Amino acid sequence: MKVIEHLNSSENTLFSFEILPPLKGKSIQSIFDGIDPLMEFKPKFINVTYHREEYIYKERDNGLLEKIAIRKRPGTVGICAAIMNKYEVDAVPHLICGGFSKEETENALIDLQFLGIDNVLALRGDSIKTESAFRPHKDGHAYAVDLINQISEMNGGNYIVDDVQLEPTNFCIGAAGYPEKHFESMNMSTDLHYLKMKVDAGAEYIVTQMFFDNQKYFEFVDACREIGINVPIIPGLKPIKNLSHITFLPKFFKIDFPDALSKELLKCKDNKAIEQVGIEWGIQQSKELKAKNVPCIHYYTMSNSTSVKAIAKEVF
């Protein structure tokens, strides 16, 4: 079932979450161990992230260094198939621009179609850690809107090779939205312009980056509606779990903590106290969002479901 069908057919706020593929060498059981505690809340879909290659330098026998590309968290498509088989819940793989040619993207989408996976979250993706800015594949897409256009074209039966009659795909496309704007955008108006381009290209729903101030989400939704973005906008929440999150989350994701949350976090002396504040704040956020009848609340678990379970018990 498509994500948009889940959203349109429910009168109540839905529950969904995102997981990471395990580090290479770990078993699929580590994924199931993270999902099992959350199944009692009846998630309608589960997102699985995709991670770009990284580069390391390995010394060769002659003493020279060789640059090698590695993927630390492979398995996105296989995990999606395993989730759908084991839990009978729809899985949403992330599909990114970085590192893929258009043909590789087309082939990946064909694989997904053959597996019965008909939802994708289309993202540009981050730059490689060793690069200061995002660099697309020379034969790939530079922006998420271009990736969405390609998926939409395939939904219309238009493939890269267009001299034969080809079967249309049937993907439901999700896109990312940023209540505090994407850090590369000049301002919020520009960011919303690009978001509308993604919706016009075929995105049927939006999932937001994490935020900790619900007012910013509400203002973001209002701003979207004012410029004609009328698709469902799913709020994304991330429970704060440890002391490092106090500095890491604002720095990496370019987001702010509201004053009330900051004051509580600064009182904490250890990770246990931080996690409890994160749970309490997550419950408060979730209850307010649910009271406003948002279509779904999407939780970023980072494959650690403890805090999300504690929040969901009080909300769903």
Q: How would you label these PLM feature ranges?
A:
Residues 1-48:
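Conserved N-terminal beta1-alpha1 strand-loop-helix module at the mouth
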Residues 14-32, 90-103, 172-190, 266-280:
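Active-site mouth loops of central-metabolism enzymes
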Residues 18, 46, 112, 198, ...:
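Conserved, mostly hydrophobic/aromatic
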Residues 41-74, 125-139, 203-220, 302-304:
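Glycine-rich, proline-tolerant flexible connector loops at the mouths of alpha/beta enzymes
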Residues 101-114, 190-194, 219-222, 242-248, ...:
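Catalytic cores of alpha/beta
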Residues 102-149:
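Flexible, glycine-rich active-site loops centered on histidine and acidic residues
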Residues 125, 138-170, 175-184, 222, ...:
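Active-site pocket-lining/capping segments in soluble small-molecule metabolic enzymes
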